[in-house]
């Protein structure tokens, strides 16, 4: 494709403006949780793969953790296996866990790996069971209604929480010029499999690697105030206040708590970004504009 002089000039300007950011992040690790609309639109999927390859090409080390809830739901439906959710968590019995492993560790993971490699990257697909990458234990879930005097412990099956990350494996892959793509399946002490929220896995991976950034792709423009305005930059103290006054609630709470834990655990910053925007990851890294909410570990 031949660019016009005007287009070529604009292209050169964009590259020039990105240079300070490239210099700043060369050699740094960025953990990106990939999910939502960005995984469903063919255009956005291709754009994401190209963005990841570009990051690696300029010396930044991306590590991808992906979700796949809709794809799991589709296969369960085709197999006539009912899905049940409690407080937003999929109840995962042994039969459902088999499907989760098939979809996340197989179909979804390999399609992402293939697309990145198709655009010039060297991606390698992993689940948390590979070399004990994501160690886990059964999540103890509770539920309480106003009528209860104490919380009720509920069994949601093979749903887990992260207890450890094999950072050495990921560092070896990154230094070998590979792009790790991780399915959020954990392994227990006895080799049992656990279905883990992808945001939580991404956060723990970012902490273990002391990543420069944790980036969570979502289907919203970012965190919003009660008037619907996007909050572009927040400290951990401000986030705590927004949770306390009810501005942040419901399905966003686990994502935000994951971001808070990451920055409090040594990650330089966490970003809640709009995955519906083309090239969202590059816009957030290489421009002042951004496409979401930045959270830093500040008390101001």
UniProtKB/Swiss-Prot annotation:
Top-level lineage group: Bacteria
A GO-annotated cellular component: cytoplasm
Catalytic activity: N-acetyl-L-glutamate + ATP = N-acetyl-L-glutamyl 5-phosphate + ADP
UniProt cross-references to Pfam families, sorted A to Z: AA_kinase
Keywords, in A-Z order: Amino-acid biosynthesis, Arginine biosynthesis, ATP-binding, Cytoplasm, Kinase, Nucleotide-binding, Transferase
Subcellular location: Cytoplasm
UniProt xrefs under InterPro entries: AceGlu_kinase-like_sf, AcgluKinase_fam, ArgB, Asp/Glu/Uridylate_kinase, Glu/AcGlu_kinase, NAGK-C
Residue positions binding substrate: 68-69, 90, 195
GO terms for MF: acetylglutamate kinase activity; ATP binding
Any one GO BP annotation for this protein: arginine biosynthetic process via ornithine
Annotated positions for site Transition state stabilizer: 33, 255
Purpose of the protein: Catalyzes the ATP-dependent phosphorylation of N-acetyl-L-glutamate.
Family according to the record: Belongs to the acetylglutamate kinase family. ArgB subfamily.
Protein name: Acetylglutamate kinase
Biological classification of the source: Bacteria, Pseudomonadati, Pseudomonadota, Gammaproteobacteria, Pseudomonadales
């Amino acid at each position: 494709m031949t660019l016009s002089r005007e287009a070529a000039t604009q292209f050169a300007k964009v590259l020039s403006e990105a240079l300070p950011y490239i210099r700043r992040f060369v050699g740094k690790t960025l953990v990106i949780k990939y999910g939502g609309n960005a995984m469903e639109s063919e255009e956005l999927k291709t754009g994401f793969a190209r963005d990841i390859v570009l990051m690696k090409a300029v010396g930044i080390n991306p590590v991808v953790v992906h979700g796949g809830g809709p794809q799991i739901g589709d296969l369960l439906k085709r197999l006539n296996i009912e899905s049940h959710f409690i407080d937003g968590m999929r109840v995962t019995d042994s039969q459902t866990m088999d499907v989760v492993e098939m979809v996340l560790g197989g179909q979804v993971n390999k399609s992402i790996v293939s697309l990145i490699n198709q655009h010039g990257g060297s991606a390698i697909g992993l689940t948390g069971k590979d070399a004990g990458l994501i160690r886990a234990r059964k999540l103890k879930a509770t539920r309480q209604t106003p009528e209860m005097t104490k919380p009720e412990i509920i069994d949601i099956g093979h749903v887990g929480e992260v207890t450890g990350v094999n950072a050495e494996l990921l560092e070896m892959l990154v230094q070998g010029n590979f792009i790790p793509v991780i399915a959020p399946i954990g392994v227990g002490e006895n080799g049992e499999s656990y279905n883990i929220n992808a945001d939580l896995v991404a956060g723990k991976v970012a902490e273990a690697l002391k990543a420069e950034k944790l980036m969570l792709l979502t289907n919203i423009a970012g965190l919003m105030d009660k008037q619907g305005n996007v909050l572009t930059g927040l400290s951990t103290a401000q986030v705590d206040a927004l949770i306390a006054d009810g501005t942040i609630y419901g399905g966003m709470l686990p994502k935000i708590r994951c971001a808070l834990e990451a920055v409090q655990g040594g990650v330089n910053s966490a970003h809640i970004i709009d995955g519906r925007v083309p090239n969202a990851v590059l816009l957030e890294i290489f421009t002042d504009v951004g496409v979401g909410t930045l959270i830093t570990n500040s008390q101001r």
